[in-house]
From Swiss-Prot:
GO terms for biological process: 'de novo' AMP biosynthetic process; IMP metabolic process. This is Adenylosuccinate synthetase. The gene is purA. It is found in: Cytoplasm. NCBIfam families: PRK01117.1, purA.
Amino acid sequence: MSSKRQTKGCNVVVIGTQWGDEGKGKVVDWLTDHAQAVVRFQGGHNAGHTLIIGDKKTILRLIPSGIMHKTVICYIGNGVVLSPEALFKEIGELEAAGLDVQSRLKISEATTLILPYHVAIDHAREKKRGEAKIGTTGRGIGPAYEDKVARRALRVQDLFYPEKFSEQLRENLEYHNFMLTNYYGAEPVNYEKTLSEAMSYAERLKPMVMDVSSALYAAEQSGQNLLFEGAQGTLLDIDHGTYPYVTSSNCVAGNAAAGSGVGPDSLQYILGITKAYCTRVGAGPFPSELYDHDNPAKQDLIGIRLAEVGKEFGSVTGRPRRTGWLDAAALKRSIQINSLSGLCITKLDVLDGLETIRLCVGYTLDGKKLDMLPRGAESVARCEPIYEDFPGWKGTTFGIREWDKLPVEAQKFLRRIEEVAGKPIAMVSTGPERDETILLQHPFQD
């Protein structure tokens, strides 16, 4: 028997290399023209992907960005935590805009559910932390992942076994309500109301629920191209980020396999999305930081300009993002963790008009020079950035679609990023529209 495999499609993983908000949604939307399926493999509705097509702005929080393409199948993998309420709200918004969603959306039966008590715990916990709060979105993501690890989570497939679901829900609420009332001093969550709401979603979800792992395997074996869409960013990863100022899931490339039910051999090209500057939402160390709306000591005028020109406000929470220079030393950490094949630099146009542009290429920590972001929030917080300065450009990069038409200074800045990172730039995004993109290396045709 021949050991030669059947011809497979080409699969691409899109990963954020910073603290999220890198512009993954636009890039995924662009790449979807070459894919037959898009897969979400982690996170929940705590991160928004903003797409601008023509004069229409769409924010997707849970449903894969590929839903905007009429022939593409969208999968929500087992690594996602799913709020049925948030899902159907998003489906309603998309269907009101004329999109066929439910026939093209497939949900893993093993996906963990976010229920009202997860949201209640999230809010109560942040309130109790006070000034030491992590800065979660308050949508129950972390508590849902906690239940999953503790093996008490209710999953999508449990909705179709009402007796088992009701028993497990009662046990879960006994535990969580005890914590809410006795430790956090908050109101308990009502069992009957929670059960009724959950059961109301069961029949609506059923047509969309399937064995996603098997479906993806079959799609790949038939030669289809799969696109895996990450949420958040590498530096927010629960294991590899600036812990404890991280999200509650693994948002690195390796989890594209575990979070969707495919093997690692299925991940052929890893595209790292990198903003031309850095942003961060919420608490946590940020070595190249210039501006923080809530910190009087971080009010640098260039940082404020980056926030204003880049419209740096959370697409889900509306919170102002902290801004700073591009950190290539942190990017090197992300490249190491994700085995990136290439980079996509986004929002280059936000740097237009700056007299000088800085690139963080390393740090000084306790008298020693480092060329890569260290592990652990305590060490990162003590890092002093080492910068290289570049002359800005007078012309605009906005909407440019060809490399040779970029200002020479912009080209030199981008080439230096490649040199420091040790990886090629595959794409450059010069605006929010799908076609405002410079293609240097096609991920699906590499």
